[in-house]
Every structure is written in C-alpha cells, then in structure tokens.
Amino acid sequence: MAVQQKRRGLSFIDAKASNVKKIAVMASTVAFEFNKATLRLRRSLHISPRSSPEVQRKATAGENSEVGSPESSLSTSRCSKRDRKLCAELSSFALYPIFGALSPSHFSSPNLLFQSEKNSSRRSFEFMQLPDTDICQIMSFLDAQSLLNLSQTCSHLRQLCLAHEDNAGKRDVTSHEITISFNQIHRRTEVRLLKRERTRTDRQFISNNIRGVLAPFSRALTKITFETTVFVTDWLDEILQLHRENRLIPLSLLFTGGALTKGHQVTGADLRSITETEFVDFVTKLQPHLQEVQLSTSRIFKISTDPSQLLGMISMLSSFGIVYERPPLHFYHEEISNAIALWKSDPLSRCCDVYMRRPHDVSSESWIKLAGSIDESRIDPYTDEVLVSQITIKHSFLVHIDLVFHFH
C-alpha cells in the first residue's frame, strides 16, 4: 500500500513537472516570437535598437537627444501602426498552439500577419479594374466632396456619378462660371464651364446643354454669360428646370455683345423673341439668389408695359444695367420716381447700382426732391447744362441701404 501511494505521489509530481515544463516552453516560445517580431518590425521601419553601435556612436557624438525625442522622424501615427502590427503578430502565434489544430484554415502558421500581407499584395489590382457595381457600392460610402472629386478624374467615373447623383447630397460650387457662345467655325451654340480665375492651361468643360457641364453631386452657384448671336429664349426653360432641381443657382445674368454694334447693325445676345413681362417673370423665379442682371446687348425686347416693369427689378437685385440698346431707351421722371418709391417702401430691398442712360426730363432739383444726393456731375460743353452722372438715394427705414444711379 505504501509503495502504491509513493508511486501515486511520484506520478503527481511528474505530472506537475510536466505542466510546468509545458508552461516554460510556451513562455520561451512567446519570448522568442516577441523578439523576432520586434526585430522584424524594426528592420521594416529602419529603427535601430538603443544598444546598437549606430545609436552608441550618435550618443558619444552628442546626438543622443535625437533618439527617442518627440521631434524625431518617427511620428505618433507610425508608432501606433507599429504597435498594432506587433499586437497582431503576437496574437497570431499566441493563439496558434491552442486553435491551430482545430481550425487550420484560419491559423495555418504563427506568422499570420506577414503571410496575409504577402497574399494580399499578390491579389492587388487597380481601382478602374473593378466592376461598375463594386465602384457604385464604394461610392455609396463617400460624402459629397469625395464624390465630386471622384467625378472629375475621368469620363468613365463621371458617367457613373451622373447615373447615381440623385441618391446623394449636393455640394455648393462657386469656383466656375458658365458661358454660352456661338461657335463661328462649327456653326453651333456651345456651353462652356470655365474657372473664374483661369489661365490658358485650365481645363474647360464643353457641351451642347447646360446640364452636361455641371459636375455631379454639386449645386452650381454661378454667373451665366450669353454672348453675341445667342438666342436667349432657347435656354430659359433649361435654366428654370435646373433651378427647380436645385442643380443650378444663377447669381448673375450677363447679356453681352452690344459694344460691337456699328451704326444700324445691331449685335449682342438676342432677346427680341421675349417680351418685357416674360423677362421680368423669369428674373422673379430665380429669386432670392439672383443678384445681378446686365442687359449689355443691342438686341433687346421691346418695352411694352406702361409704366415699365423693367425698373421695378431694382428692388430684388444688387446690380442692374441696361446699355447699348437700339433704339436708345430713355426713362422718364415719372417712371424713375415710381421705381424709387417702390424700392424705398420695400423691406426686402438691397443696395443696388443701376447703370442706364441719362433721362431727358430730370433736372438736378428733381433729384434733390427725391431725397437724393448728387455725387458726380459735369457741364455740357454745348448747352452749358449741368448733367448729373451719379446720384445716391437713401432707403426710408433701412440703414446703410443705398440706391445708386450711374448715368451715361
């Protein structure tokens, strides 16, 4: 009996010693793998250990302050990345003795991290090689600015963005302007999207309609310029449609080309197919964003309303001009007085600069009666009459809101 108990005690001691030996072997393995992973990471990141001859040489030369200092080339992000790699490396070989036999497909070797990196590098391919469905799924995780940048890389991605732009938000873009001109060589009207502060090397977007030049996932807050010989009525419906879709917000409308008029040969953007009432209604629908309208064209619509509705737009604009029209348009004192009275009584009026021809029947005393101050005037060399060039009128109850007339 005593012999059996002694054997049992010896077997227990042997079992205990065996467990201790296993733990010691596992601890040695962990320490070995830890040192191996540390050396590998130091080698990949080009970090020398403190005990290396290079570090000791720098320390003796007075450069020891650079080692481990916050101003070293190794940033915090790289340190955290190194720590994550080290933890992944340690977790891979620490879990391998336990789960390696149970799940060899997931724990095929202790060096899982670097093996997966090698496999992924062999499977890498370019972004444009992805199917369109995968690219669209990636686009669903991007914000409006990232989608806008993606659409400006190439035509293929631009078309994909255009096909899925209804499912994302819009970003305001103010860096470009739209120009509609007639190409004399190809005999067609073209729409161009140009940078506001551009050079000759900047890229241009050209299309036969306004929608084709607008960037996907954007809302264009822009100036629209109609150049000479362009029929404006062909573009009004598209502008209103894009405005309703919240894709286009015109801030300024410029109708140019009137300066090229010589004698009876009128030039400029063609507004003769639209009436005065239709034009005022078009400007009203673009409020409250539209700030400027410049009618610098000779091909203007006829003033058909009495009194004219054209001057009434000064209450909703910040700048309004009507020059180069043929035949010359001169407003009368009564029409100007009514427009000023409407502007002074409107609580939504803005500061506005009006550029127009000098009226014939308005004297300096008449401007003063309208509560205006004459800023600039000159003497007519032929009649010795005082000609008012600029006048400023204050608002009735809004402070720092002025109406300035510039006459020519």
Curated annotation (Swiss-Prot):
Signal peptide: none annotated. Residues 49-77 are annotated as: Disordered. Keywords: Ubl conjugation pathway. InterPro entries: F-box-like_dom_sf (IPR036047), F-box_dom (IPR001810). It comes from the Eukaryota. Residues 62-77 have a biased composition (Polar residues). Residues 124-170 form the F-box domain. It holds the Pfam family F-box-like. This is Uncharacterized F-box protein C27F2.7. It comes from Caenorhabditis elegans.
